[in-house]
A protein has these predicted regions:
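Contiguous segments within soluble domain cores/interaction surfaces
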Residues: 2-135
């Protein structure tokens, strides 16, 4: 049996949507690092997270949490069982979160765990805007 190798989390991206394309490619729509709202509580209709795991082999449990600014309240949590057969290949774990409610402006956190150990924390700034802006 092959030796178990703990994978590295090479990136975490936040976006509006993810699509699987022909040939195994993925398309990311609306990559962002901030959420803007004119009032609170605010509901973000669709938040997709993309995690890429690489250089690992074996089976692992991953957990993704969206946390409040004080990191005490879990807004969302997803768990996935990773099965990595060969350290040369990458695995992309995609989670879609619908209607995420942000109760107040502030710095929220996306945390990723591998077998119960915190691997990374990604900041998500939720900002109050006075009027709707267009880019």
């Amino acid at each position: 049996m092959a030796e178990k190798i703990r994978p590295n989390l090479t990136f975490t991206l936040l976006c509006d949507d993810v699509r699987q394309e022909t040939g195994g490619k993925i398309s990311l729509m609306g990559i962002f690092e901030n959420v803007y709202a004119a009032q609170f509580p605010a509901v973000h209709p669709r938040l997709a997270t993309v995690n890429e795991w690489a250089e690992g082999r074996g089976e692992f449990d991953t957990t993704l949490r969206i946390l409040s600014p004080d990191r005490k309240s879990i807004l969302r949590e997803t768990m996935t069982r990773l099965k990595l057969g060969d350290a040369r290949y990458k695995h992309r774990d995609i989670s879609i979160h619908l209607n995420v409610e942000f109760r107040e402006p502030g710095l929220y956190w996306i945390e990723n765990y591998l077998d119960g150990v915190l691997v990374n924390s990604v900041p998500l700034q939720v900002i109050l805007v006075k009027e709707k802006s267009f880019h």
